[in-house]
Amino acid sequence: SRGLGDVYKRQIVGIERRGVILAKRLQAEIERIEGIHIDCESLNVAVYRDDRDARPKEGEPCTIDTTEKTIILVDDVLYTGRTIRAALNALMTAGRPRSIQLAVLVDRGHRELPIRADYVGKNIPTSHLESVRVAVADLDGEEGVTIQE
């Protein structure tokens, strides 16, 4: 229950795709353990990315009401920080949150931006030549984290 505070002003936001599944799991665990419900939303950051100019940007602008809410932003893997930067831009265009906390399943290091997770499932140092894949049963038919070259 660390930092839950006023649950009516809390919101969990998962970054599409695997972050959404992890966010829903987090929501269910908070409800099971604390007996409280916190809304959970899905966020597509494609239109806010700065590192994919070669491809057309797909998706809709963020419409999540973030005003005066404490947002728990959830993603599967934290790497360069660019996806999180895009998510922060999206959330800020939709309102002015009271605060934003970041929860990730895996932090693999190699930041290009000054971004740090508040909640980390596992730190897994990797090389730039490796990639980390998070598998979730809802999308992949299995659960697990693998490192690939």
Give the residues covered by each predicted segment.
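PRPP-dependent phosphoribosyltransferase catalytic core
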Residues: 89-149
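Short, small-residue-biased leader/transition segments that mark boundaries at the very start
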Residues: 1-8
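Residue-level signature of catalytic and energy-coupling elements of molecular machines
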Residues: 12, 44, 100
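Short glycine-rich phosphate-binding loop at a beta-alpha junction
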Residues: 9-16
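Internal catalytic or translocation cores that form aromatic/hydrophobic pockets or channels
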Residues: 69-99
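Short, glycine/charge-rich flexible loops or terminal/linker lids adjacent to PRPP-binding catalytic cores
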Residues: 32-71, 82-85
